[in-house]
Each structure stands twice: as structure tokens, then as C-alpha cells.
Amino acid sequence: MEVKSLNEQTDKTKVIILTANHRIKGNISLYSNVRLTDYIVEARPFIAVTDAEVMDINGNLIFNASFLNVQKDHIEIIVPADMIADNTAR
């Protein structure tokens, strides 16, 4: 992935992130025309997530945050929320 200008357009993408102990719903900022897979491969050690809802693995809400960082090495699954068939994931 090439280095992008700070002036380049980004889009908020709602994602679901699963770690060993947490389920996180929130937004990440992707540059236009960049796939989520490419973003994750090229990302720094932490992924910025906005408007985050953090739940335990059983679905119990732990907290909400306007911003948090997720350590990339702890991500087991990440998927755009609009690709989930189950409407409860959105």
C-alpha cells in the first residue's frame, strides 16, 4: 500500500473485530479504494477504532468509547459490518 497524503479522502467503515476475549463494533477510516485486507496488512501495530462498543465474548457490554486503539496482533477476525448476514451484528 502506498503512502497516502493527509489531504486524501477517507471513508468510515463500520467493522466487527473479534479477539480472544472481546467483540468490538466500531468504525475505522479507510482511504478511498483501499480494501480492508490491504489496510490490515499494512497497518501499524495498533488500529484506531472510533465510536466503539466493546463486549465480552458472551455479548455483555463492557464499555463504549469514542476512540480506542486495538493491537493488530490480537485481532483474530475483522469483517465489515455490512457483510454480516445477522442484523444483530450491525
Protein language model regions, located:
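Conserved RNA-binding domains used in RNP assembly and mRNA/RNA metabolism
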Residues: 1-90
